[in-house]
Amino acid sequence: MGSATKPARKKFRVAVSGSTIDGREISGEHLKAAAKNYDPTVYGARVNVEHLISPFPNSDLCAMGDVTALSAEDITEGPLSGRTALYAEIEPTDRMKKLTDEGKKIYSSIELHPQFSLNGKPYIMGLAMTDTPASLGTERLKFA
C-alpha cells in the first residue's frame, strides 16, 4: 500500500470589503466577482511570501501553495457585519505548513486584478503570506 495522502486543504477568510489599514478600498462587488470568476484551470493563483516569488525553486521565496477555490459571503454578525468576505481554499506545500506552524507569515493578502485579460472582470492572481495584512478580518493561516 502506497503512502499517497491527499494534500491538506483548508478554507480561510483572506479579505473583507471596505477600507484597508493603509486607506485603500476593497469593493464587495469585486470580491464577489473574483470568487465567481476564479478558475484554476484558466489561471491558478499561487501562494507567495510578501507578494514576492522567486524564479528559483529552492529559494526561500518560492511558491508556497495554491489557491484551489474561492467563495464570497456576506458577513452577518460581529464588528464586520454588512461587509463581504472572500474565502480561499488553499492547498499548502509542506514548507507553508511548517512556516505557519512556527507562527511565521500567518496572515494573507490578496492580489486582485480589477480587469482580468479573459473577461475584463476582477480576478485573484495570487495570495501572499504576510505578517501585516492590509485587509481587516483576515483569518490566521493554520493547517494542523
Spans of model-derived segments:
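N-terminal, leucine/charged-rich tether regions that mediate assembly and partner docking
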Residues: 1-144
